[in-house]
Amino acid sequence: MQFTTNVQLLLDGLNTVTRALSARPTKQILEGVHLSAAGEHVKLTCSDGNLSIEMSISADVKEEGTAVLPGRLFTELSRKLPGGEVTIRVGENHAASIRCLSSKSNLAGMNPTDYPEMARVAEGTTVRIPQDKLKEMISRVVFAIATEDNRQILTGCLLEVEPTEARLVALDGFRLAIQKAVMPFELPGGKENVRVVIPGRVLNEMSKVLGDTDEYCTLVFDQSRMTASFGTTTLSTVLLTGEDIDYRKILPASFRTTALADRVGVQNAIDRASLMAREGKNNLIRMSFSGDTLAISSNAELGDVLEELETELTGDPIEIAFNAKYITDVIRNITDEKLCMRFNSNVSPCVIAPQEGEDYLYLILPVRVFT
């Protein structure tokens, strides 16, 4: 195999596909990046056995063929190349020679016949959504996905698609995040909805390679796998299976207290209070709503913080405490001018949602404080 391509093109491709590499691969071959040169393109593929990412780059292919090179080392080497054009030639012993201007390197490879073929969904339910919209949806909920849990289903994110809207739902046991995209979706075969759980790691990596464009990302699902295609990139992953939590049952039907406050003011006050909260044993922030005042406070052995802001309160006064990180994660993902918080008591969930509309919804469990 031999081809010549632009160094930046090669590096962009490697930076994309190596996101699928595992820190602890189950097989040595999965430490590598698979290269397939044919026609006027080279396909780069990496996989951890569950997640695979493939990207096609333009190249001047002199000799078609396949190769597997050490993924991280090849990427770092490509990053250090002087620029311009790079020529890569792989011989019968699987070793690669890499030539770029005055730079010459040789890299031991592996047998490409040992590399597993990328699994794709050939037939299934297809959903198309603009890349920028999907990227935004992921960024608004991914923080609420459980990183470790006895229930593996919570380490994923629920995607629900109906003819008029799509929803991403994440739940880690302490927080619930829902982000909607209201737009028409064509569901094949008269289906009324699609409901799948995508691994959190997959969504994290997708959000980093999706473009800021209204060009579509095509998602194809079967019962156990999803294939996503956008631009010159294809991603394939297994889906999580099992009984997910019915999040609708968690959402309160009504509220005793509603508070409106300036979102930027609340965020800045919480950021300052968090500095002190992190020094305490429980990382707590207290919020006290009374009359037209919101008091945000935290304390530790080293000191304390008290911030007061104006608020519009409807209903009963309330004092409630939250884990500083959980409340910070939520508020940083809101862009509305006004922050709308709804409560029933200081031991029941707080819901943060738009003052008008239903684009997003966040639910946070408070921390019970004994005084």
Annotate each language-model stretch with its function.
Residues 1-371:
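Structural preference for solvent-exposed beta-strand-turn elements
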